[in-house]
């Protein structure tokens, strides 16, 4: 009943109006799985390759017809007749057939769409929800938790057209008892933030991930307006709600210095920027910082981990790119203490699960994440619950491409009840 009989690839549109790959995997018995690949804006240099056509006359060169052709051609031919329940086997066939280190022949966008669609089809054939199937693939059947959301309510950097250097300013409703309550708390703060910004005469247009993208006097001012909104919503900052940032520091790393336009084009060394961040953590309850330095600045990261690593969560995104080879090296060198997990950085479900396992085995946390270019596909919600990862980053409280994931978490929590606890602050490295 779980034998693959047909695979279909197609070009669809993501949340930025760019094409992406969607795949359908059809099994005997009429079971179907469908999934779409996301796409990033600030990307790590060692990510698996997202295959684009490069034909400037079509979608400004961003078409994905080559990746779709790979799905409908060689990938489909290789997988028809195979058992969808063998996720590792399915992914290995595609990876071996591609034959490149970074999936550049078929594109990680092609391989990932099929990989996720296959998992959904197999779950359907087994008569179980996707999160339950993922827990079995992960070797942790029946072990679930609801993730603490990191809600990106002010967008800067590559995610917005404003003068804020730091890419994401996030809130974490750690004081909630359930994910549904956490989402309500986040929504209330989001709406109060709009009122705060409007009262200051600031723009309330939103960025790629649904957060506001105002022009602010400094990066610290973003934290100040969020603190004001948290208070206005009736919550206590540091107790009910904590703060997190994604610096995406590679985006403002120039000639060995960190150049912040929002701080008057001031240039910082690795050590100076680490202490700039440290000062912010003293002023505000920031409990997680992602990509606090450039992805290649490993000496700087070692210093940053030494200074901040026993106090807060230091998340590697561009640093580790969901790649077990790079993560292993980081663990050995004591770099950071958490990894951001993005399916499309590595390009298959099996490799994603391997990265989560390696992180957890080393005492690192794993934060499941969306990309800035998303679709209505909500697979990351099931991944977060099915691996009991504990944290999820999926944008703000607006834009259907972000809210789709929150709504899926609400549905899953309703189905699982007490089997999937919401552990709040305990999930964040250094906060237990």
From Swiss-Prot:
Subcellular location: Cytoplasm; Cytoplasm, Cytoskeleton; Secreted; Cell surface
Annotated site, Interaction with RNase E, chain positions: 120, 376, 408
GO biological process, one term: RNA processing
Cofactor: Mg(2+)
Enzyme active site: 209 (proton donor), 342 (proton acceptor)
UniProt entry tagged with the keyword tRNA-binding: no
Regulation: The covalent binding to the substrate (probably 2-PG) at Lys-342 causes inactivation of the enzyme, and possibly serves as a signal for the export of the protein; most substrate-bound protein is in the growth medium. Inhibited by fluoride ion in the presence of phosphate. Phosphorylation increases the reverse reaction (PEP as substrate). Binds to and is inhibited by tropolone antibiotics.
Biotech uses: Inhibited by tropolone antibiotics which are a possible drug target.
Sample GO molecular function, one term: phosphopyruvate hydratase activity
GO CC annotation terms, alphabetical: bacterial degradosome; cell surface; cytoskeleton; cytosol; extracellular region; membrane; phosphopyruvate hydratase complex
Chain sites annotated for binding (2R)-2-phosphoglycerate: 41, 159, 167-168, 209, 342, 371-372, 393
UniProt region (Interaction with RNase E), positions on chain: 5-34
Entry note: cofactor: Mg(2+) is required for catalysis and for stabilizing the dimer. A second Mg(2+) binds during catalysis.
Family: Belongs to the enolase family.
Protein name as it appears in the record: Enolase
Organism, as annotated: Escherichia coli (strain K12)
The organism's taxonomic lineage, starting at the top: Bacteria, Pseudomonadati, Pseudomonadota, Gammaproteobacteria, Enterobacterales
Gene for this chain: eno
